[in-house]
From Swiss-Prot:
InterPro entries: COMT-like, O_MeTrfase_dom, Plant_O-MeTrfase_dimerisation, SAM-dependent_MTases_sf, WH-like_DNA-bd_sf, WH_DNA-bd_sf. Its EC number is 2.1.1.210. It comes from Cereibacter sphaeroides (strain ATCC 17023 / DSM 158 / JCM 6121 / CCUG 31486 / LMG 2827 / NBRC 12203 / NCIMB 8253 / ATH 2.4.1.). Belongs to the class I-like SAM-binding methyltransferase superfamily. Cation-independent O-methyltransferase family. This is Demethylspheroidene O-methyltransferase. The gene is crtF.
């Protein structure tokens, strides 16, 4: 194991000087007496405490979701007593929860003591899949109960069992678990599809194959946006079996084909001039991703495009949501990791793709995109 670097000698750079001053209790006390520095210090203090209290904030949200409190006040304000009776909580415990929800701006406390839905709470309910994601976070919370043991690899995360497909076709055999996974993917995929289609122009694509397409949520969005495009879906058979009904209900009958298989074991179907990988790469290790991209290159004709769309790390400039929440979430799945756009571009280059383009996400925690082309001289 390499030794830690000794403290640098000589003068301090501006960034290190700032760190030294911020870590001085004496400087903190002086800063409290200087208006400009006081504002900076208090803002930093609030943000620091927000980090400290983050776990409790997420638990307040989880309780609101589990007890459906936001739904109960969606039609109008309610008293503490009425909400307590509806959820089985003692009034004083409901008051505790409602105060927390109001502090997080999910609820509004009225002058008469009743609680109403706030703008942020209404937005939370309207985001597809967000409530479902929070609803299964108790699994992630247990996996992170001992974060040091988790980081050392000394735990057996439960989250990996929630997402059966990450281990290949053999992992997705329980119909109940698969149905739960498919529902969550379908509910949350709509938001990703919206952002991906804003970022990447698919005009000119004749036939798109969505690999790991689940029940067809992304293809349904593509089909609506591009009415002349033919569609293909490839996923594990137990997952993809629900796709025909969904795509037919979306008005796409006659425009799609569904193919069951595992890219780990099977070549991808031929015939598409573009292949999309939406929230797929971050589920898998680098070696598995290399295999997948190799399969994609084999399935594409010369000039064919690959589109990668998912939440991505900020890389050299770490992103608050993706480099914390998404990074630890995928680590708990045991097989994947959140990658930066530059890392994805490097993986694509390594598999013979060219003309790589990076599209920073409008909402990076939802999706950014990277596209590439199979060159005409690719073997």
């Amino acid at each position: 194991m390499s030794a830690l670097r000794p403290p640098a000698r000589g003068g301090l750079g501006l960034s290190r000087l700032g760190v030294r001053l911020a870590g001085s209790r004496r400087f903190q006390l002086i800063a409290e007496r200087v208006p400009f520095l006081r504002r900076i210090g208090r803002r930093e203090g609030e943000e620091l405490f927000d980090i400290v209290a983050g776990f409790v904030h997420s638990q307040v949200l989880y309780a609101l979701v589990e007890l459906r409190v936001l739904h109960l006040v969606a039609e109008g304000p309610q008293t503490v007593q009425a909400l307590a009776a509806a959820t089985g909580l003692a009034p004083e415990r409901m008051q505790l929860l409602l105060q927390g929800g109001a502090a997080l701006k999910l609820l509004t406390r009225r002058r008469d003591g009743q609680f109403d839905l706030a703008v942020r709470g209404a937005a939370f309910l309207a985001v597809p899949g967000l409530e479902a994601m929070v609803g299964h976070h108790h699994v992630l919370y247990r996996d992170l109960a001992d974060p040091v043991a988790f980081l050392k690899g000394e735990t057996e995360p439960e989250l990996a069992r929630f997402w059966p497909y990450v281990f290949g076709a053999g992992g997705a055999t329980d119909p109940e678990v698969t149905a739960k996974y498919s529902r969550l993917m379908t509910e949350s995929q709509g938001l990703v599809a919206e952002d991906a289609l804003r970022l990447v122009d698919l005009m000119g694509v004749r036939r798109l194959m969505d690999v790991g397409g689940g029940t067809g949520a992304f293809l349904a969005a593509v089909g609506r946006a591009y009415p002349l495009m033919e569609l293909m879906l490839f996923d594990l058979p137990v997952v993809a079996e629900a796709a025909p009904q969904r795509l037919t209900e979306a008005g796409l009958a006659g425009r799609f084909t569904v193919h069951g298989g595992s890219f780990r074991d099977d070549p991808l179907p031929l015939g598409a001039d573009a292949i999309s990988l939406v929230r797929v790469l971050f589920d898998h290790s680098d070696e598995t991703v290399k295999l997948l991209l190799h399969r994609v290159r084999e399935a594409l004709p010369a000039g064919g495009r690959v589109i990668v769309a998912e939440a991505m790390s900020g890389g050299a400039r770490p992103h608050r949501e993706t480099d914390t929440y998404m990074a630890f979430y995928t680590a708990a799945m045991r097989t994947g990791r959140v990658r930066s756009a530059a890392e994805i571009a490097e993986l694509l280059t390594g598999q013979g793709f060219s003309e790589i383009k990076i599209f920073p996400g409008l909402r990076p925690y939802v999706a950014s995109a990277v596209t590439a082309v199979r060159p005409s001289d690719a073997p």
